[in-house]
Amino acid sequence: MNSEGSSEGSSEGSNGVDPRLKTGATELFGVDYPIVQTGMGWVAGPSLVTATAKAGALGILAAATMTLEEMRAAIAEVRSRTDRPFGVNLRTDAADVEQRVDHLIAENVRVASFAQAPRPDMVAKLKDNGVVVMPTVGARRHAEKVAEWGVDAVLCQGSEGGGHTGTVPTSLLLPQVLDAVDVPVIAAGGFHDGRGLAAALAWGADGIAMGTRFLLTSDSRVPDWVKAVYLDTAVTGTVVSTAVDGAPQRVIRTEVIDTLERTGILKLPRAALNALRFRKLTETSLRDLLREGLSMKKNQDLTWSQVAMAANAAMLTRATMVEGRLEVGILPTGQCVGVVDDLPSCEELVSRIVSQARARLDTCA
């Protein structure tokens, strides 16, 4: 074991947790460690969230890719497995978002996270009922806006992050957000070990959030052969592409992504053909495709070209992450995928990160 696995010289509180790792976020979330497992669509199900919660971190359920009934069942399953706090990720543009919010309140879910900023009235409703509100931000101005609306914390994701992401790296974005708001800030984008946690705390953040690193655990339900592709991907093996749904998204470079990059989605007929081709691959019904597309068009400022692919993007990811159909080729990932080389359990991962962080903090004291 290298020096980062040691924690000699550091003190612990009465509950065995290093007080240097107790932050505004750990108090707000009710967890032992300032580590968050993000609500990755089709990945962060009850098993992963439960394992994360039992390890002392905050697991977030990916309800944004679930139906209302699936979300209710998933929350019940997590509740049956652990009494530790956890969170649920919601889509603000979902037609039934109000019902989802009501269910989170009824079930006393600790945290509601959002990829897009929730409306001010939704923030107020959740807060008034004891639910912590934490949206993701990719720019200082976004953080300032949601802070004015009263959110409890923000998850600040730099361009190293997976899935939909911005253009500013964490090292530049995080200090800006920290200077802009007075609520706890969770740093995301490129984090995968205890050195990153120690660095984030040194910056002034209240913790770190990780997606890809938790995807690559033995508790993740992603098929083993899909995990193998992730483990074989180099640091240079990812690309930020707008070819999937019109918005910048970091994915593993595959033949399908390369084809989409060459084809583009600049013209509706071509985009429609791509969407229909992928609909056949993913066996998505035309009705579901149209319903998803019209919902996105109504709630987001998308062109019809973007709608044509965006409507099917979630199904492309599902076919890969759930069914293991690599021929679809949509593999969202953070840039840290190139330096991850094992599949620990969530308990092993969190313990390792905590030990490494304590060791780094010792050397910086």
Spans of model-derived segments:
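Active-site entrance/lid segments in N-terminal catalytic domains of soluble metabolic enzymes
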Residues: M1-E4, E12-P184
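Conserved active-site-proximal phosphate/metal-binding subdomains
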Residues: N2, T170-D182, H192-A365
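Gly/Ser-rich catalytic serine loop of serine hydrolases
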Residues: G41, A188-G194
